[in-house]
From Swiss-Prot:
Keywords: Cell cycle, Cell division, Periplasm, Signal
Subunit organization: The Tol-Pal system is composed of five core proteins: the inner membrane proteins TolA, TolQ and TolR, the periplasmic protein TolB and the outer membrane protein Pal. They form a network linking the inner and outer membranes and the peptidoglycan layer.
Coiled coil residues, start to end: none
HAMAP family: TolB
Family: Belongs to the TolB family.
Compartments, record wording: Periplasm
Gene Ontology CC entries for this record: periplasmic space
Originating organism: Pseudomonas fluorescens (strain SBW25)
GO BP term, pick one: cell division
Gene3D superfamilies: TolB, C-terminal domain, TolB, N-terminal domain
Signal peptide range in chain numbering: 1-21
Keyword Transferase belongs to the record: no
Protein's name according to its UniProt entry: Tol-Pal system protein TolB
Length: 433
């Protein structure tokens, strides 16, 4: 979240006792063990027309993206069964698959019926069997559903493949003509739709816990203000209009409060608004910039970025009062804090001592170890899947802002397909079902 600290300073200009590091805090730069081989066979199709999406490929990609599974390439498959009775397990043992999924799609009264079965290849036993139905336009939804069910059955972790992603695009046509759009897509970048379009910048979009509303910063009328918008209807409401900076909105776990950053009293500080009464209270104070709030699950703790010690580091504070406690000690820059679902891991933008690269890193909050997750150089705005298995972040490739996905175990790193122009400010939805 290098860009947010930088962005605050830009906005302000345009609008014209730290503990020692524990010895157990160490930096880890390498990945972990290998992913589990799985084969997702192309699903059989009993209809005449060509389907708009390849369900097996979507399921395969989902499981790969989690970092837990390594799909067997189609070209390596000795056979391609569509149902359980056609499976020859020696074919799958020969290619090293530990799990196997087969499926079949049948037209039924204007809808599609999908049957699928997941096997343990070593034991030759069914792990999961199920069915789902919908229209051809819902193929991606059904594929993500199958991925969710399979992932949870195999790992015990709820799948996050049916979630959504918010992000901002900026397409420049001339020096004084840039179009900004707020987009919502599947978590993997597919099926993007425009929620808002503006000639002025849009920043920091965030899903509410109910998944039905979003908060964001808009520079309409040439000044930053925070809005809340209902996704289904497009109806929106201005939440803040204070002098100076209004930025970095963050919903409380129950959606009843909104944390954000204001500079109305001097330096940028974190405030919390009760969404029912619209009363605000101040959480941080003192010198320096305090920004990028992120709520803990208890609804009382806020993690945030502050340069109060000279360089940006992550702190936490209680919204009801009390001092701030420093959380990060490794590296000379740690910002944009996000917690995993179990609150055991802190994901952040990190810079090592002696280096100039900004990369996504994960800190084990119990042991203090920090692991570098990415190999890109100008990372920012990391956002974590609701089950904590994947991270999406903004970075630059070939001179263009893009979004990348990395698994929390560091095994998978890949770009997301997005629209033309600069792409930035990703934000992951909560579970939607």
């Amino acid at each position: 979240m290098r860009n947010l600290l930088r962005g605050m300073l830009v906005v302000i200009c345009c609008m014209a006792g730290i503990a020692a590091a524990d010895e157990k805090n160490i930096l880890v730069t390498s990945g972990s063990d290998r992913a589990t081989p799985i084969a997702v066979v192309p699903f059989g199709w009993q209809g005449g027309s060509v389907l708009p999406d390849d369900m097996a490929q979507i399921v395969s990609d989902d499981l790969r993206n989690s970092g837990y599974y390594a799909p067997i390439p189609k070209g390596n498959m000795i056979s391609q069964p569509n149902q359980a009775s056609e499976v020859v397990f020696r074919d799958w043992k020969a290619v090293g698959a530990q799990y196997l999924m087969v499926g079949n799609i049948t037209p039924a009264g204007g809808r599609l019926q999908i049957q699928y079965t997941l096997f343990n290849v070593a034991t030759e036993q069914q792990v999961l069997t199920g069915s789902v139905s919908g229209t051809a336009e819902q193929l991606r939804d059904m594929a993500h559903y199958i991925s969710d069910q399979s992932f949870e059955k195999l790992t015990g972790i709820k799948g996050a493949f049916s979630t959504r992603l918010l992000y901002v695009t900026a397409e420049r046509f001339s020096v004084d003509n840039t179009r900004y759009t707020l987009q919502r897509s599947d978590y993997d970048g597919a099926r993007a739709v425009t929620l808002l379009q503006s000639r002025e910048p849009i920043l920091s979009p965030r899903f509410a816990p109910d998944g039905k509303r979003i908060a964001y910063v808009s520079f309409e009328q040439r000044r930053p203000r925070i809005f809340v918008q209902h996704i289904d209807t497009g109806r929106r409401e201005q939440i803040t209009n204070f002098e100076g900076l209004n930025g970095a909105p963050a919903w409380s776990p129950d959606g009843s409060r909104l944390a954000f950053v204001l500079s109305k009293d001097g330096n940028p500080d974190i405030y919390v608004m009760n969404m029912a009464s619209r009363q605000i209270s101040r959480v941080t104070s003192g010198p320096g910039i305090n920004t990028e709030p992120f709520w803990g699950k208890d609804g009382s703790t806020i993690y945030f970025t502050s340069d109060r010690g000279g360089k940006p580091q992550v702190y936490k504070a209680n919204v009801n009062g009390g001092g701030a406690e420093r959380v990060t000690f490794i590296g000379n820059y740690n910002a944009n804090p996000k917690l995993s679902a179990d609150e055991k891991t802190l994901v952040m933008i990190h810079r090592q001592d002696g280096f100039t690269n900004f990369r996504v890193a994960a800190q084990d909050l119990q042991r203090g170890t920090v692991k570098i997750l990415t190999d890109t150089n100008l990372d920012e705005s990391a956002t974590v899947a609701p089950n904590g298995t994947m991270v999406i972040y903004a970075t630059r490739q070939q001179g263009r802002g893009v979004l990348m996905l990395v698994s929390i175990n560091g095994r998978v790193r890949l770009p997301l397909p997005t629209a033309q122009g600069e792409v930035r400010e990703p934000s992951w939805s909560p579970y939607l079902n």
